Every structure is written in C-alpha cells, then in structure tokens.
Amino acid sequence: MSQIKKVVLAYSGGLDTSIIAKWLQEEYQCEVVTFTADIGQGEEVAPARAKAEAMGIKEIYIEDLREEFARDFVFPMMRANAIYEGEYRLGTSIARPLISKRLVEIAQETGADAISHGATGKGNDQVRFELNAYALMPDVKVIAPWREWDLLSREKLMAYAEEHNIAIEKKKGKKSPYSMDANLLHISYEGGIIEDPANEPEEDMWLWSVSPENAPDQPTYIDISYEKGDIVAINGEAMSPATVMEYLNKVGGENGIGRDDIVENRFVGMKARGCYETPAGTIMLKAHRAIESLTLDRNAAHLKDELMPKYAEMIYNGFWFSPEREMLQALIDQSQDYVSGDVRLKLYKGNVIVVGRTSENSLFDEDIATFEDDGGAYNHKDAEGFIKLNALRLRTAAKKRR
C-alpha cells in the first residue's frame, strides 16, 4: 500500500465517496485528488469542493461535462438506436466512459499512481469504470475500496464517518429509500421495496415525470430537426446537444414519458430490478427511428438493427473504448450521411406518437407507393417473376418431401 503516493478519486461529495477519500488517506497514506463531474445529475456540485477541502485535499477538480457527455457519448449512441435487452436505454452505462476518461487524464496530469471509484463489488459500474480506464491507460492501478474494506453495512459506514469527523448531511423531510443515479439521459432507482420484482413502485418514487394518468389532457406537439443523425433544432430553434436533452427531459416529463420498470441481466451474472425515467432518451429514440425510416435504405436499416443489440451490450458491459465498439461506430456514423430532415411528434399521456416526417433525402416515392393510378411508375407484372424466383426453393423442397 505504501507504494501508492497519489490517487485520483471519482468524488460525488456524498457520504460514501467522502468516506472513501478519508479511507484512502489512512489506509494508503497517500495524497488524494478529487474529481467531480457535472453530467446533468441535477445536484449542485460546488459543495464538493468545501467537503474535499475539509479533509485536507489540495487538488480538486470540478468540471461541467454536460456538453461533452451529450455530444460525444449520448448522441453517437442514439445514432445506433441502442437499447439493451429490448428495454434499458443505457443511461448509467453511457456515463461511465466519460468519467473514466477524465479520471485517467487527471491521473496523467497530476502524476498520480492510481485511480479510485465508489462502485460496489456487486454491480456493473466497477466493471465499466475499470475496463474503460484500462483501455486508455493500460498500467493504471485501480483501487476499489468496496472490494477491500470491511465497511459492508450502512451502520459501519456511519460509525466510520463519525469517528473521522466526516460531515453527515441530515436532509429535511423523508429520506429516499432508493439508491439513485442521475445524469442528462436518465435517473435510476434501485433498492427499497422494488428489490422485490413483484412490488409496484410507489408514485412518489418518480422524480422526473408525472404519471401518465395525471399528464395533461391535451397533447404537446414538437418538431425535431436532424442533420446526419443528430438533433440540431427543436421547434425551429437551434440547440446544443445538452440543451436538446434538457428540453426533452422537461417536456417529456411533463407528459408522463420515459418510465421503465426492468429486470435486467447484469454483466457480473445476477439479475437486478431497476426503475428508470428517461424522457429525453425515449423521445430521441422514437424520433430517430422515424427519420431513418424515411432516409435509410432497407438493407442498411436491417443490418443496423441486427448489429444494434451487440453494440448496446458493448456499452452496457463497459467496452466503449474497445476496438469492436469503435469499428461498429464507424459503420453506424457512415450510415447517417443522409439521415437529415424533420420529425413531428405528439406527446400524450406517456406516449410518443410520430405524426409526420419530411426529408430532402427521402427514399419514399409517392408515385410508386400510391394506391391510385401510378401512371406506369410501377409495373405490377414484374411481381410475378419476383414471387416465382423467391418461391423456387420452397416449391422444390415441398415436391421432394411429399
């Protein structure tokens, strides 16, 4: 332990990571550098500075990474229509590569020997943080206190905090029984009564959205503009990636959009139940598929759909910086060259309904697709040979097996 002289800690300013900071100082007798990222979690990050200073920490990094998170991580993922196991929109998974990236960069800037995080030994986050870190800094030393210490209960953590004069916030009102994680893309809930998959979540658990039953009785219409697969404007107003997500979270939440209750298969081998609110992500996925339906070639679209589950699994498992994810990303990005245009959506009581889409790159030819007289644009007789050729193997097999 004495070989470690300086550690960069992913620091939220909360009780757990404050305890980790003090534990690192005591157990490793090392200097601690804290890194706090604002990725849209909706909490004030500035108090993290005072808390770190109270523990004698000198090098403190507090950074607003919302635009980088949206632009370089969420938007590329949205081009792929990525969703894990058909339901999970990867809100936590996609945030970890950026945090790992900055941890490694700060370690290199400060000459640190190691990085540290507060992920537990049961979850996926320990894997994500560390795989992403090793991909960027192969020889980095990672300290994961939850895999080393014996502070394995809330009571032991509280006792440690009191013994070492670590401030314990006493929030007014009812304390949430859930473990929560939030960023621009989502907020997640685990623990409490929802550890039992049979229990319906209580309504007051949800923080970002009204229930669909209590959403407005009148629909909200929005127009989303795309350029090469990315949203560039809403209702005619140009917006940055982070601003897009903030707006869609607000309008989506107001209309009861984005609630998911999932039992997912964790990479570490267990099943876990989580509840998620992903208003912006839900709207973005629906709108992106709508503009692709107009502009992507059929076989290109089908190939993307075949590759998407693997791409989503890479992100979920922590392989954002892997060669296979980067290879797939290049293919996905190339597919978006003509994915530009506008999508009109109706938001109503938890539903995202596509009501219109237009594009100068549209592959929809009304002259061919019409049910009216097409003036010879499509020769119906061509279908006969097409059908017979496709039926050839079926007819041959049927004759042989009689």
UniProtKB/Swiss-Prot annotation:
Binding site for L-citrulline: Y88, S93, N124, R128, S179, S188, E264, Y276
InterPro entries: Arginosuc_syn_C, Arginosuc_syn_N, Arginosuc_synth, Arginosuc_synth_CS, Arginosuc_synth_type_1_subfam, AS_cat/multimer_dom_body, Rossmann-like_a/b/a_fold
Gene Ontology molecular function: argininosuccinate synthase activity; ATP binding
EC main group: ligase
CDD domains documented for this protein: ASS
Cellular component terms (Gene Ontology): cytoplasm
Binding site for L-aspartate: T120, N124, D125
Main location as per UniProt: cytoplasm
Compartments, record wording: Cytoplasm
Entry keyword Phosphoprotein: no
Family in the record: Belongs to the argininosuccinate synthase family. Type 1 subfamily.
Name listed for the protein in its UniProt record: Argininosuccinate synthase
Gene field: argG
